[in-house]
């Protein structure tokens, strides 16, 4: 894929007609995924399962999205985006129907979420690839900006959808909403261009090893069986051996010889495990401590997401006055403060948690671009596609593991202790950043 090629005006005009359709699918997919993250409380109650068990419907979904992004990006070089979108909607439909029919069996609900998410994963990745392949280079930033706004919008709508559907209908009704994506099929077939196929390949082995690494970590956090540590060690060893020997791996061993790249990945992994850890904790905490229903909890999340939108939109201007190191350090300090606040005022008014989530979400929005830029700038620009792909995969694995360890803590320690633990993990990320990256010279 060559995103820098010239696109004729007539072709670009036709290509732009497909953008609204892709954005609708993009927003719709994220709404569904975010809705299911919020209703873990309702699923656990309805099916009589533990917090740790129910967390798997969110953690495995995150893992599938991360791996799915790499798979769809690889397939887009050999299969038309049009065909991949149709396949994505097929997965969404199959998973949603299966989940609704077998809503009383958690193993089948889990399988349904995996199938459904395999389809949802197509939306974001294929939109970015479509913009790079079919729209003029000088307009690509504008269209990519639409995806950022769409993501923020989906967080708001997703939390409201999950909260109100689970409160006034039933959480299982969320499996019916994705079926509306079928209505997009005629528009996709009408406006999406037919592309020529060319040979490409997906690194199945590499992705399976990444999945094995992430899953073994999550299983160990859940059950603490030593066998999972052995599986983890074996998976890591096999992955490193594979990428050092294979000529077709999706990432080369040379990337891991770059200390700055590895350091940024380590920091990103630690800090982003905290992100969905707190978001997963939020509804459980407010439901058990304050007796709030999910519809009310979803409303309390909105100020945080709106703050993220505003900060994200302003981060470009702010970055002109701060270096990446300064921006990331400030963001991590604010994240730690947002988690320490409810610890100090535990049991106080609910507004404390609203303010906490506003600081938390805004800080992550502020940190995203400079931390990503630190990662991308560690290697030549010609390798930026691979860097971004593996960075995003790392974030998805980290958030999945964050949900897992938070769910495990919910069942064994107090909410106050969990908040303290999350703040300490954030401070650990800040220390690692200062030791490994903070003292090095930033690439020009």
Regions found by a protein language model. Give the residues of each.
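12-transmembrane solute porter fold
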Residues: 15-32, 36-37, 51, 82, ...
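Transmembrane alpha-helical cores of Major Facilitator Superfamily
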Residues: 27, 56-63, 90, 114, ...
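Extracellular/periplasmic helix-loop-helix junction of adjacent transmembrane segments
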Residues: 39-68, 106
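Central cavity-lining transmembrane alpha-helices of secondary-active solute carriers
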Residues: 59-74, 124, 128, 302-314
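Helix-loop-helix hairpins in multi-pass membrane proteins, especially solute transporters
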Residues: 69-199, 364, 393
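A membrane-interface helix-boundary motif in multi-pass transporters
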Residues: 167-179, 221-225, 408-427
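Hydrophobic transmembrane-helix bundles of small-molecule transporters
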Residues: 171-266
């Amino acid at each position: 894929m060559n995103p820098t090629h010239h696109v004729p005006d007539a072709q670009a005009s036709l290509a732009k007609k497909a953008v609204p359709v892709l954005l609708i699918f993009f927003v719709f997919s994220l709404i569904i995924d975010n809705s299911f993250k919020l209703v873990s409380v309702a699923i656990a109650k309805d099916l009589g399962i533990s917090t740790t068990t129910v967390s798997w419907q969110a953690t495995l979904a995150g893992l599938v999205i991360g791996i799915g992004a790499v798979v769809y990006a690889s397939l887009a070089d050999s299969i038309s985006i049009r065909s991949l979108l149709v396949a994505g909607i097929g997965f969404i439909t199959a998973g949603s129907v299966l989940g609704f029919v077998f809503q009383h069996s958690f193993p089948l609900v889990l399988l349904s979420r995996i199938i459904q998410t395999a389809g949802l994963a197509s939306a974001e990745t294929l939109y970015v690839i479509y913009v790079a392949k079919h729209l003029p280079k000088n307009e690509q930033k504008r269209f990519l900006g639409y995806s950022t706004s769409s993501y923020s919008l989906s967080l708001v709508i997703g939390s409201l959808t999950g909260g109100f559907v689970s409160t006034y209908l039933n959480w299982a009704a969320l499996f019916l909403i994705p079926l509306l994506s079928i209505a997009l099929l005629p528009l996709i077939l009408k406006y999406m261009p037919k592309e020529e196929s060319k040979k490409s390949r997906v690194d199945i082995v590499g992705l399976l090893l990444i999945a094995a690494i992430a899953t073994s970590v999550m299983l160990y956090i859940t059950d603490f069986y030593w066998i999972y540590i052995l599986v983890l060690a074996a998976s890591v060893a096999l992955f490193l051996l594979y990428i050092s020997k294979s000529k077709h791996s999706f990432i080369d061993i040379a990337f891991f010889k770059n200390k700055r790249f590895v350091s940024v990945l380590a920091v990103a992994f630690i800090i982003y495990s905290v992100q969905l850890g707190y978001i997963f904790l939020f509804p459980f905490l407010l439901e058990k401590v304050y007796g709030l229903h999910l519809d009310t909890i979803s409303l309390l999340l909105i100020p945080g997401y709106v703050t993220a939108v505003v900060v994200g939109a302003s981060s470009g201007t702010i970055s002109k006055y701060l270096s990446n190191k300064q921006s990331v350090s400030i963001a991590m300090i604010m994240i730690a403060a947002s988690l320490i606040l409810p610890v100090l005022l535990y049991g106080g008014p609910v507004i404390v948690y609203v303010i906490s989530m506003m600081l938390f979400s805004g800080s992550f929005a502020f940190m995203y671009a400079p931390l990503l830029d630190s990662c991308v700038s560690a290697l030549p620009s010609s390798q930026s596609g691979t860097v971004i792909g593996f960075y995003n995969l790392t974030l998805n694995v980290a958030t999945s593991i964050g949900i897992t360890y938070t769910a495990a803590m919910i069942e064994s320690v107090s909410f106050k202790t969990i908040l303290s633990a999350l703040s300490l993990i954030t401070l650990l990320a800040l220390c690692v950043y200062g030791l490994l990256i903070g003292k090095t010279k930033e690439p020009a």
